[in-house]
Amino acid sequence: MPRRRVIGQRKILPDPKFGSELLAKFVNILMVDGKKSTAEAIVYSALETLAQRSGKEHLEAFELALDNVRPTVEVKSRRVGGSTYQVPVEVRPVRRNALAMRWIVEAARKRGDKSMALRLANELSDAAENKGTAVKKREDVHRMAEANKAFAHYRW
């Protein structure tokens, strides 16, 4: 840890099309090898498909999908007297968003559809309907935290 001053987190510029910081972060997570314009094209195409399917606004549909994937609790390893416990801890809001976006992108990459835009659109629509791989990942994390509730007093 630095002994001098703590450097604040950088402000992220909102995305050019919708003016959303959350969407800009999502584009950055999807981006590979610094190809931001490609990532933006994929995200915008996926959002267009998602909006047509759901009949909602682009950002509204995206927010709904993200809400259904956001975890509230997770487990962290804590070593106590030679044994390691999985201690359930609450997830901070910024990390909730980051995890949800990461899980959606991972799940979309594992899908077997043709283009990445289609895979992302399908995963987002599944997430909006509370199904799909990303939602399953959140359920697994919650189940793990529930199973280890007995170790909650080891929180730090």
From Swiss-Prot:
UniProt keyword Ribosomal protein present: yes
Any one GO biological process: translation
A single GO cellular-component term on record: small ribosomal subunit
The keyword Chloroplast appears for this protein: no
Gene Ontology molecular-function annotations: rRNA binding; structural constituent of ribosome; tRNA binding
Organism superkingdom: Bacteria
A Pfam family recorded for this sequence: Ribosomal_S7
Gene3D superfamilies: Ribosomal protein S7 domain (1.10.455.10)
Key words of the record: Ribonucleoprotein, Ribosomal protein, RNA-binding, rRNA-binding, tRNA-binding
Subunit structure: Part of the 30S ribosomal subunit. Contacts proteins S9 and S11.
Biological role stated in the UniProt entry: One of the primary rRNA binding proteins, it binds directly to 16S rRNA where it nucleates assembly of the head domain of the 30S subunit. Is located at the subunit interface close to the decoding center, probably blocks exit of the E-site tRNA.
Assigned protein family: Belongs to the universal ribosomal protein uS7 family.
The protein's name in its UniProt record: Small ribosomal subunit protein uS7
Gene symbol of the encoding locus: rpsG
